């Protein structure tokens, strides 16, 4: 049976966390520097444990004002300290809750910049490996970040998006554009099935680009996140595709 992971961003101050954890197989737990706090992180970890959902850390630039979505240029040593701080916090709360932090997925601008910047990708990979070499790194399918992570000996998870539109180079349409988001569940389902079954994703210029789909992301702060997750699970099941983090 074909398998796919379904992941969601949590502990970002949204009301959907508990509902989504009944529908997904992996949870990207906010580390407190773009949103959330220690209590929301703790609750998200416990809820994930209750639902047998795999837990990953979701670190960002220190940018609460812009939800971590603004590009920043930090000195390498400062950014490493920022990442160690965030990963250490989530790992400690996971340890205290009797669960394992299994992977890392950068957030927002950090994610998008590292997808194209080899130096930034290497800094992230080195930091993650220093925390725990068994951690996997989740990133945009086909991105430089995943290639660099593998060069550093890390296992990787190729991520695709149900609720984002794509450019011809395989990158995401910037959120500053009006056509960045997939706004209805019918389009999201069509895009997901094409990615999982055909290994391609439609682009905004009318073409298609090849991708590898290990994990599908839904944004927990999205207005349609719960609706998307329910439909996606149902449609995947009907196609004989198992939603699981065991990939």
UniProtKB/Swiss-Prot annotation:
This is 5-oxoprolinase subunit A. GO terms for molecular function: 5-oxoprolinase (ATP-hydrolyzing) activity; ATP binding. It comes from the Bacteria. Gene3D superfamilies: Glycoside hydrolase/deacetylase (3.20.20.370). InterPro entries: Glyco_hydro/deAcase_b/a-brl, LamB/YcsF/PxpA-like. It catalyses: 5-oxo-L-proline + ATP + 2 H2O = L-glutamate + ADP + phosphate + H(+). The keyword ATP-binding applies. Catalyzes the cleavage of 5-oxoproline to form L-glutamate coupled to the hydrolysis of ATP to ADP and inorganic phosphate. The gene is pxpA. Pfam families: LamB_YcsF. NCBIfam families: PRK05406.1-3 (NF003814), PRK05406.1-4 (NF003815), PRK05406.1-5 (NF003816). Forms a complex composed of PxpA, PxpB and PxpC. One of its GO terms (biological process) is carbohydrate metabolic process. Transmembrane segments: none annotated. Belongs to the LamB/PxpA family. Keywords: ATP-binding, Hydrolase, Nucleotide-binding. Its EC number is 3.5.2.9.
